[in-house]
């Protein structure tokens, strides 16, 4: 009986350690989801149901990443681990890949972006953004769904890992174009674009002026210019993911210009943009042009 019990215990330990690995950065979270106060992004309609939860030891993770930033760290790389959608930890070699032009990056040194190449999975590439508000990642895999990590708990200590697919019907609209048809059409067009974009060799960098509505700023907790870092952290998260796609498909990288902070707004009553219901109908196009020119 003792041998059977011992064998059962060992099997359980092996299964748990294999399914939910732990290192100095990440540990599997076994806390009941119902007991976690979640980040408001978790309530969005498109939020996935099939997720894995991990707790992040933020400061050591940040320290390793920040060891490869700045002029003194030029051409240096670091090795980090992140969890995947299967609940396993993977290693990546990472380098800094800033989305801010130099003057803006110098002013906000705690908001950073990184690119990584898979060690565990050689086909995987990583885009990672980090700020005092937490970490977000996007992983591209050959022949598999993209994967994401983003804060799950309100205090941004617990993170969710999930694949890019979603359940149909979760959003008020669905794409009805057949996957095979759209895949073939896009592949033909993208092949031409990629050849043209990459004919010059290296990834091209373009300067981006970005303006946001007051509602956008307010959503991320910023109600005045003194809290602009909250907005820039959110913009950096989005740019990191967008640049991951642009770099892969178009050999193009966007850098946010420092003057963008002059066209970030905080008061919905005085910003130059229409309410969402009107703006999304086309009004924002003209309003944005007037703001940036």
Model segments located where?
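Bacterial Sec-dependent N-terminal signal peptides
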Residues: 1-25
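N-terminal prosegments of processed precursors
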Residues: 20-154, 282
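N-terminal regions of proteins, emphasizing targeting and processing segments when present
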Residues: 16-18, 55, 165
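Fold-level signature of zinc-dependent metallopeptidase catalytic domains
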Residues: 21-39, 43, 51, 157-293
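A broadly conserved detector of short glycine/acidic/proline-rich loop/turn motifs that flank catalytic sites
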Residues: 10-11, 120, 141, 212
